[in-house]
From Swiss-Prot:
This is Probable ATP-dependent RNA helicase DHR1. The gene is ECM16. Probable ATP-binding RNA helicase. Required for 18S rRNA synthesis. May play a role in restructuring of the pre-rRNA. PROSITE patterns: DEAH_ATP_HELICASE (PS00690), HELICASE_ATP_BIND_1 (PS51192), HELICASE_CTER (PS51194). Interacts with snoRNA U3. Component of the ribosomal small subunit (SSU) processome composed of at least 40 protein subunits and snoRNA U3. The keyword RNA-binding applies. Residues 7-25, 32-43, 202-217 have a biased composition (Basic and acidic residues). It comes from Saccharomyces cerevisiae (strain ATCC 204508 / S288c).
Length: 1267
């Protein structure tokens, strides 16, 4: 019979099953959880003895680990379990078995610990929410709620008992008849009669009595009232008398009394009656405790508050009584009576003492200032003093001067008309600025103005107001100066001060500088403020080191608007923000009236509105804002024609001025940039015709127009007595090119019985204050010079003004009384299209002149210069590139010797370069004349301004003549055809007379007329200019600039420059020779080397096809370095119609130099040509710059390279002008081959000089002879 075979791994399986049962038992144990205080014990027979001894309580606070004996016993049992009986075990197996047993023991211990942890559980309802962490102390309500919850859970302690339960002190009642009153007995009898007699407690009941009232129901052993606790021990305490209560005010008073050694007055705060009342109230509270503890707390708080209030009142009353008694005892109870004067006194009411509701501006005060008082006495007439008192800034003199004394930089904001321009310099002068014996400010007072007219007029007015010190006021502008050695107040343009800082950066002659009209933000103003900010800090530093030798410099920036954040908040400009003082202008209310619709033709709308104001509204001057000279001249003529003076009036002759005739053909001609509205679309034919009809039918308006007028606002007033709708209108123009004498007429009173009307540009916004203006007609537009950085085109564009400018214009109507401003645009356009402030000029103009001046002042890092508004980096890089082309800067952007010389001239760097290279073959006088003419402007009056342009010729198919030219004759019917023909003949004869020097060069026509003017006698100059159709004002400017340039050149080149005098005879020059003309073209090219254009058919014959019928003004050119586009026609530029080349009659030159590019009305870019240039001279001029590169030496066709040494050679190369060969983004072209002398420097062949053909042949022959 076979034996039973044990199953594989049976012992392990049995052990595993035992473990599972044990684990199941442990898990089921949590469902039979016993109470902690339960003393039941399991049956010892149901479990082995070890379990009762080894199984500890899982919920015990401390679990004791197994002892060493217990661990050994357990290990021995495991060994017996796994070791078979009577079997031999090898040493290795035994070692493995020990390791296994040790591992199993650790597993058992781990399972035991995990099982114990599973058995341990807590009630999560007892935990506190984490969201309440950090709340701090609990309120009484929260404490009571938590204590009640713990009590219900059976977890109460002494702390919860203190919160939930209150102690009750049993009161001992006296027996009846002992010490009691009859009133008390009566009260008790009444109580017994009402509620019955109270049962007396027995001795047992007294022992069981509790200090708490048991409010449980009667069936549970309570009193039957409510829930309560009867298991609280009774605490008997002796009754204590309530302590005297003090509030915090009484404690403070008590401490003060103790310090001063006085008696404690707190003893009088309460009385015995009050104490008795308090005791009775406390006893009553103990007898009837509140059910809600919170109500008890609140009631206690309210009672203590009322109690404190009552105690304070009692204490104060007693204190007052005690003080009165003390005064009686000391004899101080008698009242002193002040004697009264029987005089009628009227208090003086000063305007400055009244509260105006304005907040005073904060002005930092230098507490360490040691300035001594110093003033200059000035005597003025009563009339001038009264006029000064009426100015708003006069009342702010103290505040302004205090700010100036305590701060090196001050900003003053005041609208035009506040008097800041004329009064602030007088404040400074009277405070000692400019006085030689002044201890702190002995230097001059300098005032800069952006316009020459403002500098001259303000200097005259301040000199008049300074009375006996008026001779110490002078001005200095570009061509005129009245400043002397004793001048203490100097008005000047900002360019003059910039020039002075180049020679004296510290401005040692000045003690204060005033920058006026800073809100205009032109280039000179921005660069001045940036340099002066450094100068102020430098002078302050030097003054700190040596106060006697160096004095501080004060800088005052004045603006007509509140746009000063670029100055005050610019930490780079002013590390410490300067104080900003605001001066209110003398402003009356101004009613602003917007148009319902924005008129397309704003000039006609301005004319209609002006006529309506004159015919319907009371007296008052009218100020009309337009964009340019041509619009103003046309408007003046229309208004004078509509409201004329009588025929025999003397004012008719005064008002007779030539008026420009407008005739524009967009296809054949371009006027001057000032006369063209580049940003406004060309008016189409229908609107143009309707405008003409409106102009013709202006006087015959129908009923429909009257109905429209009635709907307009701002015409509620009526004419006054003596006024009629046909009164004459005294119309005057005002623009920058107008002579100063004509500009001053706006300040004169109009003739009797007429109304003043001024038609002006934005010059009248801030620079000049015109008196008597009550009505303002604002077109909302202005003409500004803009510069296109992408193509270098400058243009005058008409666009919307800023909101700040519009507010300035409207403010003109409120200077003398309430006024009206009529805006020729809608409020929607004003809010949507108008910018808040205009763009600074430094961001819309080329900055090469500024960069060169700053480089000459050793300001090399232009980026870090403290500009109020930093210029665009693209504009700066283009300016630096141009200066490198001209040779003013080297490759490292450092100024060269030529650049330093160029910076001495107050001109564009281009003109400075021309003057620098003009000292050859006696060409200097010619270059001076050319530069002066180009700087000032074209002095010729063109045929379109005269109205003599020929329109009877047959139209050219390429020109596409439209109806505008034909309608031009209709617009000028006053000129007789024969007279027009004769005038045209004289015009062309005059032009041909000045065009004989060179038929390809417009610049030599300018040279001819300027040189011819030198030989005309002084008394015949006016006739000469009229006869030759020249602008008198521009010719005078050209003569003055020539004298200034000659003076600068001679003073910097002659040895004795102090005695340099320029006379009119020094300006005379002979007719230039042929050689001089060739040299002059190269000198002009030196200044405009990057303004070279090549005829388009030379580079792109397929794209630019020129036929015999193509007019000269339609032949395209391409500028050098123009950006190459897929459509090459986008790069084309064309000759200006007023050029001398227009009457050439042959193909224009291959290469042309141009002065500037202008965008015409037909979207064609026109170039104002200067002269032609040949290939070799162009290469000779461009070789010093970065525009010329060279090919490798040419070989073949008899051309050989002559090697003088391994590092020197003579050869022919092909120069390339413009972009390099491998550059497809810019335009460039090859010039004619030329012989050069090259040397090898740093591994590259460099051109040293050019060699003529004869010179190269000579060198080649000499080399052959040597061989």
């Amino acid at each position: 019979m076979g034996t039973y075979r044990k199953r594989f791994n049976e012992k392990a399986r049995s052990g595993h099953m035992a473990k599972l049962k044990e684990l199941k038992r442990i898990r089921n144990k949590q469902f039979t959880r016993q109470d902690e205080n339960d003393e039941r014990v399991e049956n010892p027979d149901s479990a082995p003895a070890e379990s009762s001894t080894t199984e500890p309580n899982a919920n015990a606070e401390i679990l004791e680990p197994l002892t060493e004996e217990e661990k050994k016993m357990k290990k021995r049992k495991l060994q017996e379990l796994f070791t078979p009986k009577e079997s031999k075990v090898s040493r290795l197996k035994k070692k493995r078995l020990d390791k296994f047993i040790e591992h199993q023991l650790k597993r058992e211990e781990r399972k035991t610990i995990i099982g114990k942890l599973q058995d341990y559980k807590i009630d999560t309802s007892l935990l506190t929410s984490s969201k309440r962490l950090g709340e701090g102390r609990q309120t009484k309500k929260e404490e009571f709620k938590e204590a009640l919850s713990l009590e219900r859970q059976g977890r109460g302690n002494e702390q919860t008992n203190e919160i939930l339960y209150e102690e009750y002190e049993p009161k001992v009642w006296d027996e009846y008849g002992e010490g009691g009153s009859s009133e008390d007995d009566d009260g008790e009898d009444d109580f017994e009669a009402s509620f019955g007699s109270m049962p007396k407690p027995t001795d047992n009941e007294e022992k069981k009595s509790s200090g708490f009232i048991d409010h449980r129901p009667a069936k549970f052993g309570g009193s039957g009232l409510s829930f309560g606790f009867s298991n609280i021990k009774v605490i008997n305490k002796e009754s204590k008398t309530p302590k005297k209560k003090y509030n915090w005010r009484q404690r403070v008073e008590m401490e003060e009394l103790k310090k001063h050694g006085k008696e404690d007055e707190m003893d009088f705060d309460t009385t015995s009656e009050d104490d008795d009342e308090e005791e009775d109230q406390e006893e009553e509270d103990k007898m009837h405790p509140s059910e809600n503890p919170l109500e008890e707390v609140e009631s206690a708080d309210s009672e203590t508050g009322s109690e404190k209030f009552d105690q304070n009142d009692v204490a104060n009353e007693f204190k007052d009584w005690a003080n009165q008694e003390i005064k009686k005892l000391e004899g101080r109870d008698q009242e002193l009576v002040t004697p009264t004067l029987n005089i009628d006194y009227k208090p003086i009411i000063r305007k400055e003492d009244l509260d105006d509701g304005l907040q005073e501006a904060y002005v930092p005060i230098n507490e360490n200032s040691t300035r001594k008082a110093f003033y200059v006495e000035v005597s003025r007439s009563d009339e001038i003093q009264k006029a000064r008192i009426q100015l708003p800034v006069f009342g702010e003199e103290h505040k302004i001067m205090e700010a100036i004394h305590h701060n090196d930089v001050v900003i003053i904001c005041g609208e035009t008309g506040s008097g800041k321009t004329t009064q602030v310099p007088q404040f400074l002068y009277e405070a000692g600025f400019g006085a030689e014996d002044s201890p702190d400010y002995p230097g001059m007072v300098g005032i800069t103005q952006p316009r020459r007219v403002a500098a001259v007029s303000m200097a005259e007015r301040v000199a008049n107001e300074l009375g006996d010190h008026g001779h110490k006021v002078g001005y200095q502008i570009r061509f005129d100066s009245t400043a002397k050695e004793d001048t203490k107040v100097k008005f000047m343009t900002d360019g003059v001060l910039l020039r002075e800082m180049m020679h004296d950066f510290k401005l040692t002659k000045y003690s204060s500088i005033i920058i006026d009209e800073a809100h205009e933000r032109n280039i000179n103003t921005d660069i001045l403020i940036g340099m002066l900010s450094r100068c102020v800090r430098l002078r302050a530093k030097l003054h700190k080191e040596n106060p006697i030798e160096h004095k501080k410099l004060k800088l005052i920036i004045m603006s007509a608007t509140l746009r000063v954040s670029d100055f005050s908040e610019n930490k780079t400009l002013f590390p410490i923000a300067p104080p900003v003082l605001q001066v209110d202008a003398r402003q009356f209310p101004v009613s602003i009236h917007f148009n319902r619709r924005t008129a397309f033709n704003y000039t006609d709308e301005a004319f209609r509105k002006t006529c309506k104001i004159h015919q319907k509204l009371p007296p008052g001057a009218i100020l009309v804002f337009l964009t340019g000279q041509q619009e103003i001249t046309h408007m003046v003529k229309r208004l004078r024609k509509e409201f004329p003076f009588k025929k025999n009036s003397k004012y008719n002759k005064d008002l007779e001025t030539p008026v420009s005739k407008m005739g524009i053909n967009s296809k054949t001609t371009d006027l001057e940039a000032e006369d063209i509205d580049f940003s406004v679309q060309v008016i189409d034919q229908d609107k143009f015709k309707s405008a003409i009809r409106y102009e013709e039918d202006e006087g015959n308006s129908g009923n429909g127009e009257d109905e429209e007028d009635e709907e307009e606002e701002g015409f509620e007033e009526v004419l006054t007595e003596g006024q009629t709708a046909n009164d004459p209108l005294y119309v005057l123009p005002l623009y920058s090119l107008l002579p100063t004498k004509e500009q001053m007429r706006v300040f004169q009173k109009p003739p009797q019985g007429s109304r003043l009307c001024i038609v002006a540009t934005n010059v009248a916004e801030t620079s000049l204050t015109i008196p008597g203006v009550r009505y303002v007609v604002d077109s909302g537009r202005s003409k500004e010079r803009k510069y296109n950085e992408s193509n270098g085109v400058q243009s005058f564009e008409v666009g919307w003004v800023s909101k700040a400018s519009a507010n300035q214009r409207s403010g003109r109507a409120g200077r003398t009384g309430p006024g009206h401003c009529y805006r020729l645009y809608s409020s929607a356009v004003f809010e949507h299209d108008f910018e808040q402030f205009s763009k600074p000029e430094i961001l819309r103009m080329p900055v090469e002149s500024i960069v060169l001046q700053m480089k000459s002042m050793a300001i090399h890092n232009i980026i870090n210069f403290p500009f109020p508004t930093p210029p665009d980096r693209v504009a700066l890089s283009k300016a630096i590139q141009l200066l490198q082309y001209l040779g003013a800067l080297d490759n490292k952007e450092m100024i060269t010797e030529d650049g330093k010389k160029m910076s001495l001239f107050p001109l564009s760097p281009r003109f400075s370069k021309m003057l620098l290279v003009s000292d050859e073959k006696a060409c200097l006088p010619y270059i001076v004349a050319i530069v002066s003419a180009l700087s000032v402007g074209d002095p010729f009056i063109n045929e379109f301004e005269l109205g003599i342009n020929e329109i009877s010729r047959k139209p050219n198919p390429d020109e596409n003549l439209d109806d505008k030219i034909r309608e031009h004759d209709e617009s000028t019917p006053g000129m007789d055809p024969e007279l027009k023909k004769e005038l045209r003949s004289k015009f062309y004869k005059s032009r041909s007379q000045f065009s004989k020097l060179d038929k390809f060069s417009d610049v030599f026509r300018l040279l001819s007329v300027v040189s011819a003017m030198d030989y005309v006698p002084k008394e015949q100059k006016e006739i000469f200019m009229k006869k030759n159709f020249l602008r008198g004002k521009l010719m005078e400017e050209i003569v003055k600039l020539r004298k200034q340039l000659m003076y600068i050149i001679k003073s910097n080149t002659s040895k004795e420059n102090i005695a340099v005098v320029i006379r009119n005879e020094d300006l005379k020059s002979d007719i230039p020779s042929v050689i001089q003309i060739k040299l002059l073209k190269q000198m002009i090219c030196a200044g405009f080397v990057d303004h070279v254009a090549v005829r388009a058919d030379v580079l792109f014959p397929d794209d630019a096809k020129i036929t015999n019928r193509t007019s000269i003004i339609n032949i395209p050119y391409i500028p050098v370095l123009a950006t190459r586009t897929p459509n090459i026609e986008d790069c084309f530029v064309y000759i200006h119609p007023t050029s001398i080349l227009n009457n050439l009659g042959e193909m224009p030159p291959k290469y042309m130099l141009y002065y500037s590019l202008h965008l015409g009305g037909n979207n064609k870019t026109r170039m104002n040509t200067l002269c032609d240039i040949a290939s070799t001279p162009l290469a000779n001029i461009a070789r010093k710059g970065l525009l010329l590169t060279y090919s490798k030496p040419l070989t073949g066709q008899g051309l050989k390279t002559v090697n003088l040494s391994p590092t020197e050679r003579y050869c022919y190369v092909v120069p390339r002008f413009g972009s390099t060969v491998d550059n497809d983004l810019k335009i460039g072209w090859d010039l004619n081959p030329i012989a050069v002398h090259q040397k090898k420097q740093k591994g590259q062949w460099t051109v040293i000089k050019f060699i003529t053909r004869k010179g190269f042949q000579t060198i080649t022959g000499e080399e052959k002879e040597k061989k």
